[in-house]
């Protein structure tokens, strides 16, 4: 029974990783990202009732049996 020749596997795997890296870089480079999103998007502060009150959070494990 002949043995499996694995001498070219390293070259194949490395070239596959290089090709995938290049493909993903090309895909990502097509997106248009904003340079400074803080200047364009202004957050509006909404006052909600639970922000002004003290609330207690009960965890399920702390409830009495």
Curated annotation (Swiss-Prot):
- InterPro entries the record matches: ATP8_mammal, ATP8_metazoa
Please give the biological process terms from Gene Ontology that the record holds: proton motive force-driven ATP synthesis
Keyword Transmembrane (UniProt):
yes
Record localization: Mitochondrion membrane
Instruction: Tell me one Pfam family matched here.
Output: ATP-synt_8
Q: Which residues cross the membrane?
A: 8-24
Chief location? mitochondrion
Q: Which one of the record's GO molecular function terms can you name?
A: proton transmembrane transporter activity
Q: Which GO terms describe its cellular component?
A: mitochondrial membrane; proton-transporting ATP synthase complex
Q: Which residues carry this modification: N6-acetyllysine?
A: 53, 56
N6-succinyllysine modifications at: 53
Domain of life according to the entry: Eukaryota
Annotated membrane topology is: Single-pass membrane protein
Q: Keywords for this entry?
A: Acetylation, ATP synthesis, CF(0), Hydrogen ion transport, Ion transport, Membrane, Mitochondrion, Transmembrane, Transmembrane helix, Transport
What is this protein for, i.e. what is its function? Answer: Subunit 8, of the mitochondrial membrane ATP synthase complex (F(1)F(0) ATP synthase or Complex V) that produces ATP from ADP in the presence of a proton gradient across the membrane which is generated by electron transport complexes of the respiratory chain. ATP synthase complex consist of a soluble F(1) head domain - the catalytic core - and a membrane F(1) domain - the membrane proton channel. These two domains are linked by a central stalk rotating inside the F(1) region and a stationary peripheral stalk.
The record's subunit annotation is: Component of the ATP synthase complex composed at least of ATP5F1A/subunit alpha, ATP5F1B/subunit beta, ATP5MC1/subunit c (homooctomer), MT-ATP6/subunit a, MT-ATP8/subunit 8, ATP5ME/subunit e, ATP5MF/subunit f, ATP5MG/subunit g, ATP5MK/subunit k, ATP5MJ/subunit j, ATP5F1C/subunit gamma, ATP5F1D/subunit delta, ATP5F1E/subunit epsilon, ATP5PF/subunit F6, ATP5PB/subunit b, ATP5PD/subunit d, ATP5PO/subunit OSCP.
Sequence similarity: Belongs to the ATPase protein 8 family.
Protein's name in the database: ATP synthase F(0) complex subunit 8
